[in-house]
Amino acid sequence: MRKWGRFLTPDPIAKVAADWAITSKSDSFLDVAVGEGVFLIHAARRLKELGASIQNISNQLYGAEISRPSYNVARQRLLELEGVTTENLYNGDFFNVVAERNASAPRSKTIQLIPAVRAALGNPPFIRYSMISGATRRRALNRVAEAGIKLKGPVDASVLFLIHTSSLVDDSGRLAIVVPERVLFTDYGSLARSHLREKFRSVRLVLCNGWSFSQASERVVLVLAANSGNRVFSIERMDFDSGISPGTASPKQVQELGSREAWRDLWIRTKLDPQGHEQFKQAITNPNLHTLQEFAKISIGCVTGANRYFVINKEVMSHYSLPRLYFRRAVAQAKQINGLFFTNEDWLQLFRSNENCLLLRIDEGHPAKPSRQIKAYLDRGRRLGIRSGYKLSHRAKWYKVPVTKTPDVFFTYMSHQFPRLVINNTMAVNLNSIHSLDLTIGDKIAFCTAFYNSLTMLSCELTGRIYSGGVLKIEPGELKEIPIVEPSELGLAGDLARVTPIVDGRLSRGDLEGVLDVIDPIVLGRGLGFNDAEINALRASYLKMRQVRIE
């Protein structure tokens, strides 16, 4: 299943989706990614409950499944569990399925025409745009264009599924689709959100408490969209383990979402209790706050396309007798940077500990002909098929990794305990698992020290997305908006300089609460003028959110 980015849907969510989407015994139904048939089975049961006959159900069910083994399993399970056989299941690419009402243009022989359905359900593959290639990508982009949407760049595959699915639903239909949280609760998810608002009168985004895909690396949302009822857009939480269905629960907040700011405020309301939300709203309006982008140019690190090959340790370098000339010092993982500073001694410790911290770099600054050992290593890469990788196949020379300049500061892209802003006191570069920051501010140490306050850390929790294991992921565009102070303009540089060694030591030990004990009174108290009660409230909100994430 991982080949297709597919993770089997638990029964509780499939039942909730089917019961909500199917409201009449005559409703036609489409499963956009059949898998092993869990949505089909619950749809058949729902139609039976509403009085549909087996024969009618057979004619009302439609579905697409690209995997032949899964397709066969789904048909067998539908027959064994519900007594339903149907000829309306298509073993092929979902983007070949087109509604008859949209079929005026000439079509290829592979196109599967179906009537527009009353209900569309499913759990599309959790895959990135780069994993859709060739004819499948062309078909997906054609379907999106037919829906009247012009893409400005790569989007998540789930967005393509969501848009095409909406084109297969009739004018009074319903849609119940499982998508990764990242598709809707990020800035780059605005395309999906705006499309849902334009296509449907009512959209409910259900955060699935107590339920998830154990194999998947991220949290999910159930999208419930309908072309009936009041015009609303809501986010709500549901605890499926407690038997609560979206049909009976009240939204956390309901309102029209016309602006990015309104969307973000609604999202924050789902994360904080009412008092914490109000406190945060007031705090971030402080006139002495800035955003990180005002003082930093933020970019991703080096993209190798094959880290295991290009980023090695001293043992591999020794084994292949590779000259040190061809390697750059590198930071490959968040766990390699811990304190407020990353020093030459820190890198040497990584090297001595046999950590992957050497980046292969072959460029114009090297001899015209690589050494015999390097040529042998490149030949090994060819035999392993390294150059056929997605990123490498687009390079003029597959082995020439585009290396970014040495950054002033590292920021952990994927963080477990807490995000880290680390001053780079070496010539090391970083991979794209870590963000690069070039600061335009004079006192870099005070600036980075001030980062570790409860308000800024709470903003990181609210801005990022949570992946399995409680990992917090913050994209470069999201990092730009993080609120921070400029210490010099508030007269805090001296106070921060005095506590810098303490902060460095506590960060190295992972003692963030100890760091907040030192920084909050300086930054939030003396700098922003918050009283003790306000500081404690912000800190309590932050620690609660962090605890929920990492548990």
Tell where the protein language model's regions lie, with residue ranges:
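Conserved SAM-binding strand-loop segment of SAM-dependent methyltransferases
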Residues: 85-94
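Signature of N6-adenine DNA methyltransferases within the class I
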Residues: 2-3, 8-16, 33-41, 66-72, ...
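Conserved acidic residues
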Residues: 27, 118, 408
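Short, solvent-exposed loop/turn segments at the edges of secondary structure
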Residues: 57, 200, 216-220, 355, ...
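Polybasic, glycine- and aromatic-enriched phosphate-binding surface used to engage nucleic acids
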Residues: 275-493, 498-505
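Class I S-adenosyl-L-methionine
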Residues: 1-55, 59-80, 98-105, 124, ...
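Short helix-terminating capping/connector loops at secondary-structure junctions
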Residues: 52-58, 83-85, 112-115, 171
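Glycine- and acidic
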Residues: 1-3, 29-30, 60-61, 145-149, ...
